[in-house]
Amino acid sequence: MKIAIGCDHIVTDEKMAVSDFLKSKGYEVIDCGTYDHTRTHYPIFGKRVGEAVANGLADLGVCICGTGVGITNAVNKVPGIRSALVRDMTTALYAKEELNANVIGFGGKITGELLMCDIIEAFIKAEYKETEENKKLIAKIAHLESHNANQEDPDFFTEFLEKWDRGEYHD
């Protein structure tokens, strides 16, 4: 399995630790940068990770910046990417199993290296639990990637809100 990984200059050391961990587990790592501590901009590296995954060069991706917010937002702008900012195992597993996330993001100054490694390994091993409902939700999310008139409809998500109101979803 190939894992694309990218970061900004703030968390290069953390990225390298995660990369070393993944290699020790037998995964092929595609290092999308950055490679040192020279000031740079996280969107560049989020985009690179996203493109590697979306183009099939990598199976999954990992993005890390200081808080994780910026790089996760950046990678989510790449069509075909479903990324989640995670800080715990439960969130990572939900993202993969229910939403078929293909990239996870971390705040390298918030989440410790060992915890990141544990979460990433669980994320990689988790499997998407395909259901008709999950497929429909993912299709709705993917539909947002391109502009279309339906997105302007204030009732775009009404079907899912009605199911929530009927108690078909739970926290």
From Swiss-Prot:
It comes from the Bacteria. It holds the Pfam family LacAB_rpiB. GO terms for biological process: D-allose catabolic process; galactose catabolic process; lactose catabolic process via tagatose-6-phosphate; pentose-phosphate shunt, non-oxidative branch. Signal peptide: none annotated. The keyword Isomerase applies. It is an enzyme of class 5 (isomerase). Its EC number is 5.3.1.26. Keywords: Isomerase, Lactose metabolism. Pathway: Carbohydrate metabolism; D-galactose 6-phosphate degradation; D-tagatose 6-phosphate from D-galactose 6-phosphate: step 1/1. One of its GO terms (molecular function) is galactose-6-phosphate isomerase activity. It catalyses: aldehydo-D-galactose 6-phosphate = keto-D-tagatose 6-phosphate. The keyword Isomerase applies. Heteromultimeric protein consisting of LacA and LacB. Belongs to the LacAB/RpiB family. This is Galactose-6-phosphate isomerase subunit LacB. It comes from Streptococcus equi subsp. zooepidemicus (strain H70). The lineage of its organism: Bacteria, Bacillati, Bacillota, Bacilli, Lactobacillales.
